[in-house]
C-alpha cells in the first residue's frame, strides 16, 4: 500500500512520475536496509518491545511526509521524511512467520531434522503467504479508491490508519510471541551475511524488491495514459490474486526438491512470466499478464 499511495500523492502534486519513481526507489532501498536490523532487534529484545518503539516513529514520519508533499515544500524534504519513515519499517511477514515457527516447533529454531515438521511449516508459511496476498489484493483497491475518489492524500492516510489499528492488535497477541534471545557474549556462529548462499539470496531479493516497486509505478502510469487511472488498484489486485492461487497450491504440495532449487526455479519462472507484460497494449491484456506473473511470487518468497 505504501508505494502505491506514495505514487498517487506525489504525481497529483508534482505531476512527475520521475520524482514519484525516485521516491519509491529510495523508500524501497531504505526499507531493505532497515528491516533486517529491526528483525534482529526483535529477536534480541522481543517483538513487542521493538514494535512499541518503532511504529510511533514510522507513523509520525509518514504524517510529516504527507504534510510536506501537500504543502509543496522543497522536494528534498520529501526524500528526508520518506527515508525516516522507511528507516523504521519492519518485516511484518517475517515476524509472523517467526511466530508460526515458535508455535509449531517451540523447542528448536529449525525444522530441518524432521520431514513432517518441514511440511507443516511449509503449509503454515503458504497460508501466511495467502494472507499476505489477500492484503495485497484489498490494499491497492482501497488505496486507489481513496486516492481517486476522495483525495490523493487519502491513500497514504488509509495506510496510516491500518498501521495504527493493526499493530496494537498484533502486539496484544502475547501467546504467540516467541521469547527474546539475548545476544551471547561469545557467539559461536559466524554472521549469517558471510554465508555465500545467503549473499546470493540477498542479491536476488534486493533486485526482486526493485521489480515489485517498479510494477506499481508502471501500472499507475499505464492506466493513466489510457484514461483509467482508477483501475490501477484492480490490476495490482489481480497480480496479487495470481500469487494467492499459487500460495494455495504450494501449501498442499509435499515438495521433494530442496528450498534452494525451488528458489531458482521460481526465480526463473518469474523472469519468463514477466516478458508478456512488455507486449501488453491494453488494460485487459496487462491484467492477464499480471495474473500469470503472480503465479511465481508466493512460492518464491515462501
How does the language model describe each region?
Residues 1-32, 188-239:
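Helix-loop boundary and gating motifs at the non-cytosolic
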Residues 33-47, 147, 245-259:
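Helix-to-loop junctions at the C-terminal end of transmembrane segments
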Residues 44-57, 255-268:
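Cytoplasmic membrane-interface "Motif A"-like loop-to-helix N-cap segments
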Residues 56-73, 171, 269-281:
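C-terminal ends and interior cores of transmembrane alpha-helices
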Residues 61, 74-92, 206-207, 286-299:
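Hydrophobic core of transmembrane alpha-helices in multi-pass small-molecule transporters
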Residues 66, 138-159:
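Transmembrane alpha-helix termini and helix-breaking/packing motifs in multi-pass membrane transporters
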Residues 81-134:
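Cytoplasmic helix-loop-helix junction between adjacent transmembrane helices
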Residues 260-301:
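C-terminal transmembrane helical hairpin of 12-TM major facilitator-type secondary transporters
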Amino acid at each position: 500500500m505504501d508505494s502505491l499511495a506514495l505514487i498517487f500523492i506525489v504525481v497529483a502534486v508534482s505531476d512527475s512520475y520521475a520524482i514519484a519513481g525516485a521516491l519509491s526507489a529510495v523508500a524501497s532501498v531504505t526499507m531493505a536496509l532497515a528491516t533486517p536490523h529491526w528483525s534482529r532487534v526483535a529477536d534480541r529484545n522481543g517483538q513487542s518491545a521493538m514494535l512499541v518503539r518503532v511504529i510511533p516513529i514510522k507513523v509520525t514520519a509518514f504524517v510529516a511526509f504527507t504534510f510536506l508533499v501537500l504543502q509543496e515544500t522543497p522536494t528534498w524534504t520529501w526524500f528526508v521524511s520518506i527515508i525516516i519513515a522507511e528507516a523504521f519499517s519492519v518485516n511484518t511477514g517475517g515476524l509472523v512467520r517467526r511466530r508460526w515457527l515458535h508455535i509449531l516447533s517451540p523447542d528448536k529454531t529449525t525444522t530441518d531434522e524432521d520431514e513432517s515438521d518441514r511440511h507443516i511449516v511449509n503449509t503454515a508459511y503458504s497460508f501466511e503467504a495467502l494472507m499476505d496476498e489477500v492484503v495485497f489484493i484489498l490494499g491497492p483497491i482501497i488505496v486507489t479508491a481513496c486516492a481517486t475518489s476522495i483525495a490523493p492524500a487519502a491513500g497514504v492516510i488509509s495506510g496510516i490508519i491500518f498501521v495504527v489499528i493493526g499493530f496494537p492488535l498484533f502486539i496484544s497477541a502475547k501467546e504467540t510471541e516467541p521469547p527474546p534471545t539475548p545476544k551471547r557474549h561469545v557467539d559461536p556462529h559466524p554472521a549469517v551475511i558471510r554465508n555465500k548462499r545467503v549473499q546470493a539470496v540477498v542479491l536476488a531479493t534486493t533486485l526482486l524488491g526493485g521489480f515489485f516497486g517498479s510494477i506499481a509505478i508502471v501500472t499507475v502510469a499505464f492506466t493513466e495514459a489510457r484514461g483509467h487511472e482508477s483501475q490501477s488498484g484492480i490490476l495490482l489486485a489481480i497480480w496479487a490474486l495470481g500469487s494467492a492461487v499459487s500460495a494455495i497450491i504450494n501449501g498442499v504440495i509435499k515438495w521433494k526438491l530442496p528450498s534452494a532449487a525451488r528458489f531458482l526455479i521460481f526465480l526463473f519462472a518469474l523472469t519468463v512470466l514477466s516478458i508478456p507484460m512488455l507486449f501488453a497494449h491494453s488494460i485487459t491484456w496487462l491484467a492477464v499478464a499480471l495474473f500469470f506473473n503472480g503465479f511465481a511470487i508466493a512460492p518464491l518468497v515462501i
